[in-house]
Amino acid sequence: NKDYLFDSEERLEIVRNALFKDLKMNKKKIILISFKSLTTNLCKKYKSNIILRGLRAVSDFEYEFQLAGMNKKLSEEIETIFLMSDIENQIISSKFVKEIWKFNGKIDNFLTKSATKILKSKLK
């Protein structure tokens, strides 16, 4: 389990701002959901049989592969599709961004404008 700096509602708001304010994506085509249950249960609720997971590095794959296997055991009809992140984003992690901020480094290149603003206010 991860210790999160932001609770689930705050994380949802960060994603909402990044997608709709910073990246100007179409709100009508994206649904953001925060949930506290098994992903397979969420898939069933929304009649989806596909889980998309992002990978930054080979080190992510082992965990994600095991997770996909467990999801398959829980719900045979669900398939997991892995997407590699763009090369420019493969090095970014919350741990590194917080470390850079801690030592007064510039984090603007790693986050959207709204996420940078929220993180800076949280880490004061």
What residues fall within each predicted segment?
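Nucleotidyltransferase catalytic core that binds NTPs
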Residues: 1-124
